[in-house]
């Protein structure tokens, strides 16, 4: 769809900021050697942003974000497969899940961003999701916590070396809610 943000330049600026660019105090950071941990630029956080869930206000915002992330100048974001799990085309309820699983595959050699305004925020477990960006105002704390729980599910492999059925390798030791 041709969806676009009304304040597209501001949203673009935000995309640049979460990557560590366009920081108003960039000169100060250079002088002091300190820098806040922006999600998509801090090497300590990046491994947990390999598969993220962005919770947006509505279907139009999901499509506008997908379009903006795909724009030619946004080269960083093109390493992520963006899945829009919003609107009638995404299907009802769990029907929105297969495209997400297909994009993630095993989760090791892929990077994904799932855009949603409500679908897949309850009753769904995608072990590879390890971060959620809350990009909307939520009236109910239940909605907030239900969405946050999506990234809290464990991701581990039982018997990773094939020689100890009691051994478990934890692949997702932490998760983040931004």
PLM feature segments, named:
Residues 77, 81-178:
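Conserved RecA-like P-loop NTPase helicase motor core
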Residues 1-116:
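Conserved C-terminal RecA-like helicase domain
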């Amino acid at each position: 769809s041709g969806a676009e943000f009304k304040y597209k330049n501001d949203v673009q600026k935000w995309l640049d900021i979460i990557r560590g660019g366009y920081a108003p105090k960039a000169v100060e950071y250079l002088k002091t050697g300190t820098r806040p941990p922006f999600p998509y630029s801090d090497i300590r956080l990046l491994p947990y942003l390999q598969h993220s869930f962005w919770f947006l206000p509505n279907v139009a915002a999901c499509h506008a974000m997908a379009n903006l992330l795909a724009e030619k100048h946004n080269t960083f974001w093109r390493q992520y497969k963006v899945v829009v799990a919003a609107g009638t085309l995404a299907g009802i309820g769990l029907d929105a899940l297969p495209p997400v699983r297909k994009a993630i595959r095993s989760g090791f050699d892929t990077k994904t961003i799932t855009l949603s305004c409500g679908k897949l925020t309850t009753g769904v477990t995608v072990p590879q999701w390890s971060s959620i960006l809350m990009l909307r105002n939520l009236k109910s704390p239940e909605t907030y916590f239900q969405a946050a729980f999506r990234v809290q599910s464990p991701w581990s492999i039982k018997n990773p070396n094939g020689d100890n059925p009691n051994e478990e390798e934890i692949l997702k030791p932490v998760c983040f809610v931004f």
